[in-house]
Amino acid sequence: MKPSLPRAWFDLCIIPEHDKVSPRQNTIETKGVLNPVGSNIAPPLNNGVVLIGGPSRHHNWDANDLVSQIRNIIKDDSHTTWTIANSRRTPAGTANLIMNDPILKDKFFQIDDLPLNWIDQKIESCGRIWVTADSVSMIFEALSTKAKVGIIDVPAKRSDRINTIAPNLQKLGWVYHGDATPDIHRPNLNEANRCAMTILKRWPSLMTANSNSSLL
């Protein structure tokens, strides 16, 4: 993320593009937040996951509309085995609506009941991924796979750098959004690997130091 201190004080800054910083030699701009997901293997399209965030500084929340959108996604793609998972930001009322919905309740998993890294593993194993628009990190995790990615609408509080991410991805043709069909040729992101390679190219001594330490 963009540091609170002047960038000139750092050897290197890794900052998401949506933070809109000016180009500098000591700055790598990334598409989204760095994440541990990165797979070149196309997962089966008959596995799907819906990932739910929650209200934030940038987004309001309409639980009834959200549940309606999820229900439509699953009805429209009934041949897919769907899993629904919430996050720690998801309001309890939203979870209750899903658990009382006859179509969704058996597909729903609460984040507090899931093991560590479950979300990352699920993302890498599903060929269809839908994420609520407020969940920027999960959107870019999904885009770091070969899956077909869709964004579920969440009401924005105002137009800002965060809540314009989803519409911008739609314009690029990278995601399903509403009736839009994404471009099948979207890039398979692996920004963590790209940044690591850039760092090693800039400071090759780091690779030597790591090799020496592994021999100890």
Task: Locate each region found by the language model.
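Short, polar loop motifs at secondary-structure junctions
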Residues: 1-5, 14-21, 88-91, 103, ...
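A nucleotide-sugar donor-handling region in carbohydrate enzymes
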Residues: 7-63, 178-179, 184-193
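Short internal beta-strands
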Residues: 14-15, 81-88, 150-153
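Short, charged/polar "capping" segments at the starts of alpha-helices
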Residues: 21-23, 58-60, 89-96, 157-161
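Active-site donor-nucleotide binding/catalytic segment of nucleotide-sugar enzymes
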Residues: 35-92, 112
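Donor nucleotide-activated moiety binding/catalytic core segment of transferases
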Residues: 99-137
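Catalytic binding pocket for nucleotide-activated donors in carbohydrate/polymer assembly enzymes
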Residues: 137-187
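Leloir-type glycosyltransferase catalytic cores
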Residues: 166-216
